[in-house]
Amino acid sequence: MKNEKIVVLYGGDSPEREVSLKSGKAVLDSLISQGYDAVGVDASGKELVAKLLELKPDKCFVALHGEDGENGRVSALLEMLEIKHTSSSMKSSVITMDKMISKEILMHHRMPTPMAKFLTDKLVAEDEISFPAAVKPSSGGSSIATFKVKSIQELKHAYEEASKYGEVMIEQWVTGKEITVAIVNDEVYSSVWIEPQNEFYDYESKYSGKSIYHSPSGLCEQKELEVRQLAKKAYDLLGCSGHARVDFIYDDRGNFYIMEINSSPGMTDNSLSPKSAAAEGVDFDSFVKRIIEQAQ
């Protein structure tokens, strides 16, 4: 309801701070333009609890990305303060933040996802890797420090860079179209096909404004239904709630592979979730409204 006090959480201290600031501003501007009693709070530093206790919001729109918004700490804090919010629970956030844990759960339930394992100094030295492969931090977002490697030399460089962000995983490389689906609780939106500026949808491709987006994706009716069902099943298996996004690769044999689940997706002008909603005829303001009104 519009008489509720809403805090938009954005910023934070993760490597995705700048993207989060843009998401937060877009969401805050939308809420205010729609008549909501909304204020923005930068979650950086150590004063977040004090700010929330002072403001006493009814709901929080979580526009934090990376560890600050997706590792479960903010969800846990909001739940302890009994503040409804737009992201997943602490438990689900912890799981989805760690790509390896998420992948192991999905594989246990026979969901289609590329094979992967943790990458260590020992494994790099053994030189028994099948190329090409993807190397990335196990935790993190926006494809920061994510590499396609085709040789042991590239592998060593990628491992060195990715390890700056924590544990590193190496994943089977799957060639195909990059597809994504946004979800808000029981609402599953249209798939979006991304044609990245670079070889894959890396950090530069995401924020340069040069990638091409097809929304709707152009999948046939049967495949559109299939990818939406897979997205919702993955969302449910990992215990997600509120706003999330499921990313896929769609190969030339007609197979979908779940790449990851993002429990606090971007909400900038260039972000994928608003494009997914727009393909259903839901504009940005309406999408923001749906997300905040379904906060749990």
UniProtKB/Swiss-Prot annotation:
Question: Which compartments does it reside in?
Answer: Cytoplasm
Please give one Pfam family short name.
Dala_Dala_lig_C
Q: In which pathway does it act?
A: Cell wall biogenesis; peptidoglycan biosynthesis
At which positions is ATP bound?
Answer: 129-180
Keyword Nucleotide-binding on entry: yes
InterPro entries attached to this UniProt entry: ATP-grasp, ATP_grasp_subdomain_1, D-Ala_lig_Van_CS, D_ala_D_ala, Dala_Dala_lig_C, PreATP-grasp_dom_sf
Q: Which GO terms describe its cellular component?
A: cytoplasm
Instruction: Give the catalytic activity.
Output: 2 D-alanine + ATP = D-alanyl-D-alanine + ADP + phosphate + H(+)
Name its co-factor(s): Mg(2+); Mn(2+)
Q: Which residues form the ATP-grasp domain?
A: 103-293
Q: What does this protein do?
A: Cell wall formation.
Can you tell me which family this protein belongs to? Belongs to the D-alanine--D-alanine ligase family.
Write down the HAMAP family for this protein, in alphabetical order: Dala_Dala_lig
Protein known as: D-alanine--D-alanine ligase
This chain's source organism reads Francisella tularensis subsp. holarctica (strain LVS)
Q: Which gene encodes it?
A: ddl
